Design a protein with these regions (language model features):
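ATP-binding N-terminal substructure of ATP-dependent carboxylate-amine bond-forming enzymes
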Residues: 1-107
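Short amphipathic alpha-helical segments and helix-helix/interface helices
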Residues: 16-20, 119, 142, 174, ...
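Hydrophobic anchor at the start of a short beta-strand
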Residues: 29, 129, 186
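Short acidic-hydrophobic, aromatic-tinged amphipathic segments that line or gate anion-handling sites
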Residues: 51-57, 133-136, 168
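A conserved helix-loop-beta module that forms one wall/lid of the active-site cleft
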Residues: 95-164
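Internal nucleotide-binding/catalytic subdomain
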Residues: 167-281
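Activation of the activation-loop gatekeeper triad in protein kinase-fold domains
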Residues: 287
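Conserved small/polar residues in nucleotide/adenosyl-binding loops
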Residues: 290-295
Length: 295
């Protein structure tokens, strides 16, 4: 019997269904979390073979000891997943420590976490991306902005969603940003005038698609956050062929296997010098493993 460790199986609340189906498919499902066992949904308790409570999932040493305990008791761990971007690096660290090969280890995380590193994999897939620069200070930031032209977009090179994302339209905006930013590494990109089209699906252990879908987001998350607008998206009945081709090429370039995937692309609203023509597909958030779930 294979051993599957599920980190924080009670969050989101619906994740008990993953545990149930893992058990139904012959896995030994071992949970690690910081919620008391009696607080877990009955459906989750019924789906777990054992649960190890830690005082805090933020405490790496405690979680490490929990994995070590399960390893001692049940033998080699075959899978370790949280299906939660917040724990992405920690999951990779534990896989590295315990040589769990069914998910990314620490040496594979750059292409997953850093937007600047994602771009070369988009290039490998033959998909253009916005020109970018890793900000060091005011002088180089202004130089890049003047090279590509305003507006430019800045955001953490490693980050989730639109957190700390800014659209800068003038030199004064760049000066404000440099004066007020935190110590994180920021990536500055040329602004892309387009709507977001996603490629979503399930990839099997051989890298082949089992299921494909997608949606359109007319207004970017950045604009929604910065303007306090409404979040709107809708599913497409049929994926445009150019999005499907881009999605399949990206999955292959990143070497994705045994995951759910959520890939984001811009579709240009108009011709844009240096990027492409109206309707062209531009790489956005490259395989954002934020939305990659273990399958």
């Amino acid at each position: 019997m294979k051993n599957f460790i599920f980190i924080s199986p009670n969050f989101p609340m619906t994740y008990w269904k993953f545990c149930r189906e893992l058990k139904n498919n012959g896995m030994r499902v071992l949970g690690i979390g910081d919620s008391p066992y009696d607080d877990l949904l009955q459906e989750l308790r019924d789906s777990l073979d054992e649960y190890y409570k830690v005082s805090s999932l933020e405490n790496y040493d405690e979680v490490f000891k929990a994995v070590a305990f399960f390893t001692y008791k049940y033998g080699k761990i075959d899978w370790l997943e949280s299906n939660n971007e917040y724990w992405l690096m920690r999951d990779a660290a534990l896989r590295t420590e315990f040589n769990i090969t069914t998910g990314p280890k620490l040496d594979e995380m750059d292409k997953i976490k850093f937007k600047s590193c994602m771009k070369k994999y988009y290039a490998k897939a033959g998909i253009p991306t916005a020109r970018y620069h890793l900000v060091e200070g005011l002088e180089d930031a202004l130089e890049f902005a003047h090279t590509v032209g305003y507006p430019v977009v800045v955001k953490p090179d490693s980050g989730v969603g639109a957190c700390n994302t800014y659209k800068l339209q003038f030199d004064e905006d760049v000066r404000w940003f440099i004066s007020n930013k935190d110590d994180a590494v920021y990536i500055m990109e040329e602004f892309v005038n387009g709507y977001v089209q996603t490629f979503d699906g399930i990839v099997d252990s051989k890298g082949q698609m089992l299921f494909e879908s997608g949606n359109i987001t007319p207004l970017s998350i950045m604009d929604i956050v910065n303007t306090q607008g409404d979040s709107v998206y809708y599913l497409v009945k049929e994926l445009p062929e150019k999005i499907r081709k881009a999605g399949l090429a990206t999955v292959k370039a990143f070497g994705v296997k045994s995951r759910f995937v959520h890939l984001e692309f811009f579709v240009l609203n108009e011709d844009q010098a240096g990027l492409g023509k109206k309707g062209d597909v531009i790489g956005l958030e490259a395989v954002s493993y934020t939305h990659l779930r273990a399958h």
